[in-house]
Amino acid sequence: MPAAYRPADCIIELVFNEDGHGVDFIFRYCNAEMATIEGVPVEEMLGRSFYEVFPNGDKKWLVSYADVALNGTKHILHDYSPEVDKCLTIHCYQPEPGYCACVLQATDP
C-alpha cells in the first residue's frame, strides 16, 4: 500500500513559543512501525516530547510539522535522520488543528 494511504504511524502535538514558532512536539500516538523505525518502544515515546526522547534531535523537521499543524497543509519530507541513522520519507497531514500526523518510510543510508 502506498505510504500516502496508510494510517498514521504517529500523531504529534506541536508546542509553540510565545512568538508562535514551533519549538517541540509531543508524541500523542505511535504504532509499532514508528517504534521500529525510531528504535524506541512506543511506551517510551507516548506523552513525551521529541527532545525528551532524542535530546540531541535535529530541529529541521519543526518548520514543516508546524505548518501542517497550524495551516492544514500537507508535506512530503525526504531527509536523512541522524537520530535513527536512516533516510526518511515522511508524509504529513493535519488530523485536527494543532496536530500533525505522519506516515513514515525508512531506508538505510
Regions found by a protein language model. Give the residues of each.
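Alpha-helical sensory/transduction surfaces in regulatory modules that relay environmental signals to outputs
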Residues: 37, 44-46, 50-53, 68
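PAS-family sensory domains
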Residues: 28, 84-86, 94-107
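PAS/LOV and related PAS-like sensory modules
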Residues: 1-18, 109
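Soluble sensory domains of the PAS superfamily and closely related sensory modules
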Residues: 57-76, 84
